[in-house]
Amino acid sequence: KPVFNKEISSEVNVKAIFLNYVNAIGGIDVLNKVKSITTNASVKIPNAPFSPKAEIKQKHPNLNSLVMTVEGMGTLMSQKFDGENGYTEQMGQKIPFEKDQINSEKEKLGLFEEIYLDSSKMEIISLNQIEGKDLYKIKINETTFRYYDAKTYLLIMKEETSSQAGNEIKSITKYSNYKQIGGVLLAHKREVVSGPQTIVFKITSIKLNEEIDDSFFK
């Protein structure tokens, strides 16, 4: 039977957990050399009659793009952020990012956030067993929590609350199947849980340091 709220050693703090995570996935020297990440995935959407493909491109410090396509149907949706502004496009309709969305993207200062996040402003909330693993729950800010494995220090889960059209929406992203790519340990499975729906990204390839022009993110 899982024990909830296990005692946390006084030697453990957010800074130490972030450092252990950075070391676990490759170390700061290796991570600082990564200037872009291109991820391809097959996507499972519940009850959808098709399985989209996703291409995610990230470029240092915070440029990112997600494009989902379906064979024979073209682009299902795309979301882009160019460092200043962003938008989501779906069914030919372009919705610009709201101010808080832009600010939260701008706050990202690199591809591996744990390197530069100010741990002194964050706190460990608990050490609990979730799905058989002991996880440290860290409060990043009022709307974001992250869960790290107490044994491997890998990031297992992220919990975020955002407001869309006046409604609060909570989404959980689970990370698993970590594999090494170019000296960096990266999750090859992501599950995004939003409301009753779980979308599964099964990652088929990851490329580091591909040349990507800034204009791609516009």
Segments predicted by a language model, with ranges:
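N-terminal mature ectodomain segment of secretory-pathway/periplasmic proteins
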Residues: 3, 9, 16-92, 124
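Flexible, processing/modification-adjacent segments and terminal tails
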Residues: 9-12, 82-144, 163-169, 216-218
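Short, well-ordered turn and helix-capping elements at secondary-structure junctions
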Residues: 25, 43, 70-72, 126-128, ...
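A generic beta-sheet turn/junction motif
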Residues: 47, 59-60, 70-74, 131, ...
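Short, mixed charged/polar active-site loops
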Residues: 49-53, 74-78, 94, 145, ...
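Generic beta-strand structural signal
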Residues: 59, 80-81, 129, 148, ...
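Short, surface-exposed linear segments at secondary-structure transitions and domain or protein termini
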Residues: 61-66, 87-90, 106-110, 180-183, ...
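Gly/Pro-enriched, hydrophobic low-complexity segments
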Residues: 134-218
